[in-house]
């Protein structure tokens, strides 16, 4: 993004040497920890509602119907498939909120959560693990092909960056909740779609990401958001540096031009956009993911829409490696896009979030048009958004035109850059997108239906509240008198 003040020379070079996808997405989440189903989809190639290998039954008009079951992680996931094909597999990433059954199958596994501002406590640690692994391969003269899953703990909060990078982006590791962080001209500007508050309950207002991130908490003022963006930028540039170290090692080994490199993320993040902070929403800034692929046969400096999901990664890397993808994978290989033979692999994209109030948020995108619906039963919120993303890529809503907001962002949306759901001129388009959303929900075995949809005979899933596991403190015994 040339408009961003974030400096990522390594990723810029990777992009200029490969292909950038402008339409890459995660499918969604049924929990506040969006990274968990996102990573499980990468590992398994399964769609969102087919992830849980429960084998349970649900009722449909009085009849028992088998729930879609997920794959056995010991047989059909990314490391298992490549292990079987003779690859040496290695991973390093954060601990937790992932796919443990698959993670355990990597031949070499070095996971730890590293969100500090030093080499030993931050992103450099993850790079060190990959560099050590490659050095050992080189020393032992191993010839087997390799698959490396190279992940980081940052830029997930807490975003305690390296001091020199925090200084570069005018940020501080703010810890005093009673005060605002200091203003600094070096901080990133507010995003164009910044809001001081989301205008309605989006379904998960109490999740940790929205109220408990250290340095932000429930604040959405300019000082807090710009400082947190600076912290995110500091962490992101450090990741760029660490990726560069590994790419330099591959080049020194003579392997760089013989290796497919896929760069992506679990999800996006709001940090002030639309008045939100976390990842529990389906706006473009959070639903979309960055995606770059470089490797043999890919035209340098190319760009495509793609319309890909993270769950397509397994099918694609298998295709590139000449390995048969497991039958349990539901992903589509986007190799034809990489080779310039196609612009997209699917015409319609479906997304869901119901980690908070259910049914939650659903969205569907086709071409330039996107429909998002919010159905939060516990608060009675029922809201519909219709956007033409070509005309309104930032998904501006009426609140963005407020005289309290435009001076802060320096952006005044045009008259057509609003939610079009209530405009009679777009009634036909709204009806078309509503029908498309229902079709996608049925196709993906979404267990919920929204307020204006037929229930299809589905019994609303019952989500049991987690019991309070804290044991009551026992009263202290009085001390015996001497």
Language-model regions, residue ranges each:
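Catalytic-site neighborhoods of secreted/periplasmic enzymes
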Residues: 37-140, 146, 158-166, 341, ...
